[in-house]
Amino acid sequence: MAAPPDLQDEPLSLGSPGSQWFGGRGDGEDEATAVMGARPAQQDGEPAWGSGAGAGVTSSRELCSGPARSPPVAMETASTGMAAVPDALDHSPSSTLKDGEGACYTSLISDVCYPPREDSAYFTGILQKENGHITTSESPEEPETPGPSLPEVPGMEPQGLLSSDSGIEMTPAESTEVNKILADPLDQMKAEAYKYIDITRPQEAKGQEEQHPGLEDKDLDFKDKDTEVSTKAEGVRAPNQPAPVEGKLIKDHLFEESTFAPYIDELSDEQHRVSLVTAPVKITLTEIEPPLMTATQETIPEKQDLCLKPSPDTVPTVTVSEPEDDSPGSVTPPSSGTEPSAAESQGKGSVSEDELIAAIKEAKGLSYETTESPRPVGQVADKPKTKTRSGLPTIPSPLDQEASSAESGDSEIELVSEDPMASEDALPSGYVSFGHVSGPPPSPASPSIQYSILREEREAELDSELIIESCDASSASEESPKREQDSPPMKPGALDAIREETGSRATEERAPSHQGPVEPDPMLSFAPAAALQSRPEPSSGDGASVPEPPRSQQQKPEEEAVSSSQSPTATEIPGPLGSGLMPPLPFFNKQKAIDLLYWRDIKQTGIVFGSFLLLLFSLTQFSVVSVVAYLALAALSATISFRIYKSVLQAVQKTDEGHPFKAYLELEITLSQEQIQKYTDCLQLYVNSTLKELRRLFLVQDLVDSLKFAVLMWLLTYVGALFNGLTLLLMAVVSMFTLPVVYVKHQAQVDQYLGLVRTHINTVVAKIQAKIPGAKRHAE
């Protein structure tokens, strides 16, 4: 048999894997035009799919061997051609849909001049996952041939250009690339509809392969990529060797390799004339087995973890005591490529919406209860039971429940709040674990729910016993902080109510008793109101008792007793009207001042009184600067003289008594920050009250008071004309040290004269007010 003609001088087709195909875009476009013009002729004989495959086989055979030559050994025709021609990408799918029933035409062309590349594995959907490495479809950056590499092609991945009707299996990761690449939406729909289609070799070829050992080098192993490439290279590098084999066997082998080859629509005119001959080809379609689906699903675990929408075969459960199971074996992949909608997944749930709403309302009703009695098993089996401890409102809001049910779809919800002293191995009430459980949705009477019912009944009994003991041991005010520490997951509304109640109690305790009967604080009344609003009456089926109102009634007498015991100390707090004295100085207090004014210690009172008189008389004769300087010199002369005297005396007497002013030096006269703050607050109080009073008088808030102030200022004008300021200060100091003593000695006579003076003053004031119309009406 003659050798096939050398095809290097001819422009290579798109199906050849050589580098000459990438030379220009014009050749590819001409070839695509030629193919589109001849498609109706290919559909006359057989169906579109079979005829396309048959034509491809015949054309490849005729092209390699010539019209008078027997067909050579089948060559693999792996090509990346269509990805490099954007114009061909736009024409080939659309023209196929117009002429035929939507099937893709396949033309297989063997190239005897160029060795095959590893592109045969590039277009397969199985993609040797078992070898543990990624294939060329996932990493096209590793070319194996001397021709231009795939990244140089301006298009996208070649397997994305073809629909899955042509025999290419696509994994879910590849389907996302197909959605981005296909320009025609009909091809996109077909690609999504048929994701798992594989064309396998018929059984006849396997039987004939045993009789022809020379062709065994062409067999492909899906699990050994290296062996596949080496065997194909040996079988193809002898283009001139004729192979006298039967045509059907060659066709079968060619069709077997078409599983790896792309579907090429662009052919030259010469190639198209040869491809009009059709030959029968047997096509078998096999479905992908479930283990393969599991392997492909395990390649993208991140997407499964992020998606919370389960398929009808999986039911996510929300539990409290079981940890999360992240093992791949526990995750069952969806049975179909598409995920169920939210309406479908919710319709298949084990808990209906009405039951969920009833459970939420029941949880709200039991939020502030302190004891709970166990429910019968039949009643709890109808709907999920929610149980919370008193003072621990760990109840999710209805919005949270609806959001969680919408996200998780079919779910079994168990809202169980753990008591910290009920069981040591139980998890906290705020802990929730998510896990996927394969199988049908559980029924309400499943063993897991029955187990949770028994567990909740046991915890309810323990809760009731603990609450009874805690009520006898301490009051509710002592229990609330401990419960807050035991259970951090508490709703913000309940925390706000507790804070407002405690703040109002502190305000009530600090309230002064001289302001009359204590009125109920609005903050204090708000917290119990909020608690009562969120505490509806329990249903008839609940046997739990509500001892909260009696406990609150018992707290009221205790709070009143505490507030009454603290009321005497509250009156001592300085206020705008209650405090009249400044805080005591560290070395001078009120009792010392009284002792000085009443001359109880004559020596000490004489020294202080003489010092004040000397200072004031000096100020009347000299300036303030001169008086300060002279007083400082006098004090220093006295202390220095005394210090020298003591030193000489100790030297003469040969004694060591130390410093004569040692006691005064060790005396603490510093003011602490608290004392300074007290003095500042007291001074601020007086200054603010004085400013307010002056504003009221000068702005005539009260006409009578303003007139009185005017009369006082008028009298002071006469006093100022007669006396100096220092003279008035001297008179005040003298009066301070003399009047108290005189009043003590002549108290009866002084009171009599003071009464007469007070009566006379009141008479004069009455006469003045009678002459002023506005003042008279104001007095009435």
From Swiss-Prot:
Keywords: Endoplasmic reticulum, Golgi apparatus, Membrane, Phosphoprotein, Transmembrane, Transmembrane helix. This is Reticulon-1. Residues 593-780 form the Reticulon domain. It holds the Pfam family Reticulon. The chain crosses the membrane at residues 607-627, 709-729. The gene is Rtn1. It is a multi-pass membrane protein. Residues 1-76, 128-176, 201-223, 293-576 are annotated as: Disordered. It comes from Mus musculus (Mouse). GO terms for cellular component: dendrite; endoplasmic reticulum; endoplasmic reticulum membrane; Golgi membrane; neuronal cell body; nuclear body; smooth endoplasmic reticulum.
